[in-house]
Structure formats: structure tokens, C-alpha cells
A protein has these predicted regions:
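Conserved acidic catalytic loop of the alpha/beta-hydrolase fold
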Residues: 1-12
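C-terminal alpha-helix
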Residues: 3, 170-177
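Short, hydrophobic alpha-helix immediately C-terminal to the catalytic nucleophile
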Residues: 25-29, 168
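Active-site nucleophile elbow and catalytic-triad environment of alpha/beta-hydrolase enzymes
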Residues: 97-116, 129-131
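Short beta-strand/loop motif that positions the catalytic acidic residue
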Residues: 119, 125-127
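Conserved loop-alpha-helix segment in the C-terminal half of the alpha/beta-hydrolase fold
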Residues: 128-161, 166, 174
Length: 177
């Protein structure tokens, strides 16, 4: 949010991938007048007062807590292997090498919204439709029910790696309004 203020940015298209959906929701809630569009890219869409852990299935939440306790000194969650996200085989080793632990607190912190994000010009949801363990189906269905612009792309969670051309077209469409 500070970058938007400091650089005096306007007509922004904010894109949030995965956990980044939580971030763009918070930014949009605080400065919707600066944002032309939100794009949730196979992402979490939290409600006011909800944490990421609240939105996850119990088995995912428990797995993160156990991983943090066993491998993350109790405060960080090790990355999930790229294969789980159905990242294309050619990029899996690279993705695994780039990923880092995530603070457990980021999963537990509640998002506080006053719903001014509703003033954003357009909201889009792009769903990666080709990975079995996806926790995003419900968010995609909710986006459709809310009347948001939606699109399915048949690939794993890292759309930007698996289908960059389709993603570029979708983002340009969102930016065009």
C-alpha cells in the first residue's frame, strides 16, 4: 500500500496469486479509489475477520501446524513441493529451489475489511483447473456467484509458468476493463 501512496499510482490492476489474494483484498479495502481492477489468480478470497487457516480444510491446516512444529522451529511453514501444485515437470526443480518458508502467523492473522473494495471497477478470478489438491474451487464458485469475471485455465497452480500466454491475455483483458 505504501508503494501506491509514495509513487502516486492510480488505475492499478492488482494481481494476487494464491496467498496473494489475501494481500490484494486488504490493499483494495484500504485504497479502492486507486485500483481499476483486482485479479485473483488461483487465490484465496477471505471475508472480513477470516484468516487463511479459517479458509483451509482442516487437514491442510493441521498439516501446516505439524510441519511448522517438526521442520520450522514452530513459527514457519516449509514450502509445499511443486509437484503437489501440478507444476509442469520441466519447472518443478526450479520452483522448489525458489520457494521459501512462510511464517505460520501469516496463516493465522485475521483480515479486517470494511468492504470498500466493492468500489473497485472490476474484479476477476482466474482458476487453475488441473490439479487435484486445489483448495480454490470454492473461491472460484463464489466468484461466479458474485458475478465477477471468471476464467478457467487447464493447468496446475502456477499458471504463470504453465500457461503464460493465456494468462497474459487474461490480464490484458482485465486491464482493459
Amino acid at each position: 500500500a505504501n508503494l501506491i501512496r509514495w509513487e502516486e499510482l492510480t488505475d492499478i490492476v492488482l494481481v494476487g496469486h494464491s496467498y496473494g489474494g489475501c494481500v490484494i483484498s486488504g490493499v483494495a479495502d484500504r485504497m479502492s479509489e486507486k485500483i481499476a481492477a483486482l485479479v485473483y489468480l488461483d487465490a484465496f478470497v477471505l471475508e472480513n475477520g477470516q484468516s487463511l487457516h479459517d479458509a483451509l480444510p482442516a487437514e491442510h491446516r493441521q498439516g501446516q501446524l505439524e510441519a511448522a512444529a517438526a521442520l520450522g522451529d514452530g513459527w514457519r511453514v516449509p514450502p509445499i513441493p511443486a509437484a503437489v501444485f501440478n507444476v509442469n515437470a520441466a519447472d518443478r526443480a526450479w520452483v522448489d529451489d525458489q520457494c521459501t518458508d512462510q511464517p505460520l502467523a501469516s496463516f493465522q492473522q485475521k483480515l479486517h475489511l470494511d468492504h470498500s473494495a466493492a468500489a473497485v471497477g472490476s474484479i476477476h478470478y482466474i482458476y487453475a483447473a488441473d490439479w487435484e489438491a486445489t483448495p480454490f474451487t470454492g473461491f472460484y464458485e463464489s466468484a461466479k456467484a458474485r458475478g465477477w469475471s471468471t476464467r478457467e485455465i487447464a493447468c496446475g497452480h502456477d499458471i504463470m509458468l504453465d500457461r503464460p500466454e493465456e494468462l497474459t491475455a487474461a490480464l490484458l483483458q482485465a486491464a482493459a476493463g
